[in-house]
A protein has these predicted regions:
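Soluble extracytoplasmic domains of inner/organellar membrane proteins
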Residues: 121-155
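Alpha-helical adaptor scaffolds
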Residues: 30-35, 58, 63-70, 75-125
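TPR alpha-solenoid repeat register
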Residues: 60, 94, 131, 165-169
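Long, contiguous interaction/recruitment modules in multidomain scaffold/adaptor proteins
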Residues: 1-45, 49, 53
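The canonical alpha-helical register within tetratricopeptide repeats
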Residues: 46-49, 83, 120, 154
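Terminal, low-structured helical/coil segments at or just beyond the last alpha-helical repeat
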Residues: 1, 6-12, 149-182
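Register position in tetratricopeptide repeats
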Residues: 70, 104-107, 141, 175-179
């Protein structure tokens, strides 16, 4: 027992000394090139300033919309996404983000313009797992559970076994299957 304790302590001390030698040395310096990350509000302000000079920058408009959603300013995000949409109406990611922002303003329901945006995304990329997921949500909101099931089954078919979103879509599929049984 004593020998095992001594070996344990020796290995622990040895490990700490090796790790301390491997750790990067940071010299105390006021200007070491490491900046604090910007807050979401600061990021939004920088993007808005940048867009004054570059109003046609699609990626900046899309990032601004995402940041505005992140701060809960859905109305402003819809405006930013609309500007980005006018520049590039065929960007799948934008279509999904834009539709989601509009749906957030509609109590989470995908109808009207948000539905049209999802349908456009589906026509552009009917093999996209994200698009199929959203198309299933649209169908479920319209109480077309068979169509929702079809979209989600196709999405699961296209996914690898370890895909991070697989569980979410399987749960959605289970929910509508339970609704159809009742």
């Amino acid at each position: 027992l004593i020998w095992s304790m001594m070996i344990f302590l020796f290995v622990g001390v040895l490990s700490l000394s090796i790790y301390s030698q491997l750790a990067p040395k940071i010299m105390p310096n006021a200007d070491n090139g490491i900046n604090e990350p910007l807050s979401m509000t600061e990021s939004i302000n920088k993007l808005e300033s940048y867009l004054i000079e570059n109003p046609e920058d699609f990626q900046a408009l899309k990032m601004l919309g995402l940041a505005q959603v992140g701060t809960g300013n859905v109305e402003k995000s819809i405006e930013s996404f609309e500007k980005a949409f006018l520049i590039n109406p065929n960007d799948i990611d934008l279509l999904l983000q834009y539709a989601s922002a509009i749906a957030a303003n509609q109590d989470g329901k995908f109808y009207g313009k948000s539905k049209i945006l999802i349908e456009k995304a589906l026509s552009l990329d009917p093999q996209s797992i994200q698009v199929l997921y959203f198309a299933g949500i649209v169908a479920a909101h319209q109480t077309d559970l068979d169509q929702a099931r079809g979209y989600w089954q196709k999405a699961i078919y296209l996914m690898t076994e370890g895909h991070p979103d697989r569980n979410i879509i399987e749960q959605a599929l289970d929910t509508i299957l339970n609704l159809q049984v009742k």
